[in-house]
UniProtKB/Swiss-Prot annotation:
Origin: domain of life: Bacteria
Name under which the protein is recorded: Negative modulator of initiation of replication
Source species of the chain: Idiomarina loihiensis (strain ATCC BAA-735 / DSM 15497 / L2-TR)
Example of a GO cellular component annotation carried by this entry: cytoplasm
Protein's gene: seqA
GO biological process entries: negative regulation of DNA-templated DNA replication initiation; regulation of DNA-templated transcription
Length: 160
């Protein structure tokens, strides 16, 4: 998948021709141009099923009032894009504690100052009592676990 920059008026035009929620810009353009996909389906399996960049934008992130709120918002967008793969984040751990779990209790057992919070609209919990640098590192690890290339993982991290 390639990324291109387009003018706002073209973006608005493409977005106005969306037929269903979650339809990608590529699908809309193929339909508008009456072009079939030239890529075989097997190749698309190496890329994430849906890109978080289709849902996540700077303005939405900046509305969140704190670093923790932004952190949880970004994680929730990653979960929404990759719900079936998200359980892979359970493998992300620190030296002495677990970072992600399916329950608050599981995180509390790995430390009494973890301040666990539920990732919105997901069954997963994450520790939030870390500094911003550690939260950025965690976001990078999550993105890489979900199949994003390093450059895209860094872009996701930089939303924080």
């Amino acid at each position: 998948m390639k990324r291109i920059d387009i003018d706002d008026d073209l973006y608005t035009y493409i977005a106005s021709h969306t037929r269903q929620i979650g339809e990608s810009a590529s699908d809309i353009l193929r339909r508008l141009l009456d072009v079939n996909s030239s890529e075989p389906e097997a190749d698309s399996k190496s890329e994430p099923t849906e890109s978080v960049f289709n849902r996540l934008n700077e303005q939405d992130v900046r509305i969140q009032k704190s670093v923790v709120a932004r952190f949880l918002y970004i994680l929730s967008m990653l979960y929404r894009c990759h719900p079936s793969e998200f359980s892979q984040v359970l493998d992300i751990r620190g030296r002495d504690r677990q970072y992600f779990a399916r329950s608050e209790e599981a995180l509390l057992t790995s430390g009494n100052s973890t301040n666990p919070k539920q990732i919105p609209d997901s069954p997963f919990w994450v520790i939030t009592n870390t500094n911003t640098t550690k939260k950025k590192a965690m976001l990078t690890q999550v993105a890489e676990k979900l199949g994003y290339q390093s450059a895209d993982a860094e872009k996701i991290r930089d939303f924080l």
